Amino acid sequence: MDDVATRIEHTVLGPTTTPGDVQAVLDTAIETGMRACVPPYCVSMAAEYAPGVELTTVVGFPHGQHTTANKADEATALAEEGADELDVVANLGLLRAGEDESFRRDLAEVVAATTRPVKVIVEAPLLDEDEKHRAARLATEADAAYLKTATGFADGGATVADVELLSTYLPVKAAGGIDSWEQATAMFEAGAERIGASSGDAILEE
């Protein structure tokens, strides 16, 4: 169970998330050994409050349509504030428009802006099969460390099929609608290395 806990990022990223909500997630992470994924504005507080917890935050969240310079600056700042890993949202507008090099460069500049591992959120529920492959290939070429299935804000969540597809390119963080031990197990069996879930504590309690 301890090994499973270290592969779960207990997540709190809702639009009304308070510092108190983040502290509650961190308390659970401390107790269970889970990682935590918190909003950018709480990174500094979280790093000070729970220095032993592996801390992830998000960049360009939730739509990925910030300018590349803004994303890169955000990544640099959040790493300096204490984030151990960064989940950056890909710009799907560029992908959908067929501007593959611009899509890749947007991600590559974020990766280059920090020494922290960068996971690229491809928002798989919004993509067709060709777009999933292109997004995964281009993120790989941008030197991403992981692919992440979704932000959790789009309709549809993580699927076994998407994890299987994406894991042929890079390690995968499955996220979006995972709230049970059965779902988590299915994602791990499909090849996910990590899971992001707002119900991390409930998953471990089953």
Region spans (language model):
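Helix-adjacent hinge/juxtasegments
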Residues: 75-88, 103-107, 111-113
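Short, well-ordered coil/turn segments that N-cap beta-strands
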Residues: 32-34, 51-53, 82-84, 114-118, ...
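Glycine-rich phosphate-binding active-site loops on the catalytic face of alpha/beta enzymes
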Residues: 61, 80-94, 141-159, 174-206
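Hydrophobic faces of well-ordered beta-strands that scaffold small-molecule active sites
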Residues: 4-10, 36-38, 55-60, 86-88, ...
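Conserved N-terminal beta1-alpha1 strand-loop-helix module at the mouth
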Residues: 1-81, 134, 138
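Conserved, mostly hydrophobic/aromatic
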Residues: 9, 46, 78, 120, ...
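Active-site-adjacent beta->alpha loops and helix N-cap segments on the catalytic face
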Residues: 19-20, 38-54, 65-70, 93-113, ...
